[in-house]
Amino acid sequence: MLATAKMSGVAFAEGVPTPAPVQTPTAADDPAASKFSKLRGVNLGAWLVLEKWMTSDTFGGTEAEDEYTLCQVLGNKAKDRLDEHRDTFITARDFRWIKSSGLNAVRLPVGYWALEAPAPYVECSRYIDFALDQCQKNNLKLVLDLHGAPGSQNGWDHSGRAGAINWPKDPQNIEETLRVLESFAQKYGNHPALCGIELLNEPRQEVPLDILQKFYQDGYTRVRKYLAPDVAVVIHDSFRPLEWKNFMQQPAFNNVILDTHLYQCFDHEAKTRSGLQQLAFALNRRTALDEMKTEELPPMVGEWSLSLPHKAMSGLSSLQMESVTRGYAGAQLLNYEATRGWFFWSYKLEQPSEWHFRHCVERGWLPSDFSV
């Protein structure tokens, strides 16, 4: 999902812009992209890839900070601990609620250990099956997102193992990632609910661009042969949103979506802005989204939340804080509706917060019906 020092990598003007009319992409823009014409969804974060800050109870009784270490510490008890979490954190009731809210999609983060788990990980393939089947039952689409790669593509806990960024340093790590992606495509490529496979979540800027671009091209080749034309291949911008012009163009590459993650709470420059300035910043993101958009690589916003730096709320009354939060939600939705789709991070956490989609809806910060 995120780390405490992430930035969008794009500078935005401070002035309050006049938003351009939103033109929703449709299947007519690209007939092969019909499953990805307008997705409104949530991430099922911390379910099949653990994040301690979201589900600390799962880490109870240990000092582990990531899934790798937790499984290592628990040893032969790891499967029972993780299965209990996986069985209860997301259930059929959650998919029904997601559908009832008017959303039409979920983004499902999984690790490279999902199908075949090297020690100490615990595989979770039956939960992917469950998620896809629940999506089909509730007329939802699913983006399968490879959130953690061998060696770690970003060094953050949500890659499975926090620490060094070793993924790009060993060709075997990259080849294993490609093998896993091909296995995903073989197993799930024909599922009616699948609308996209994301090749890699949030590869950090330290990953050399040439290595990452070759990986994306190779990954496309490995999965596309198993996917219907209307199932997208999704690539993340690596927090370098303007580096993808003229990349993976048609006709060699078809139905590719560029994922960007937009968080103001981790932008160092944004931490000094007032609440009003935060709203102006959010409104101005449309400019950045337009700048990164190309005909070949239309964008989606794969992660966003309502969390803002503490400075934004400093000195505000409760009513003002509520107004800023609602305004921030509206500003983001206004702009993200102009993309192929968006996914809030995350559907739920153990504790209510600006990251907890259901809580945000119940508080009135977000709409209660997204089907309008």
Please provide the spans of the model-predicted regions.
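Aromatic-rich peripheral "rim/lid" segments of glycoside hydrolase catalytic domains that contact
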Residues: S318-V372
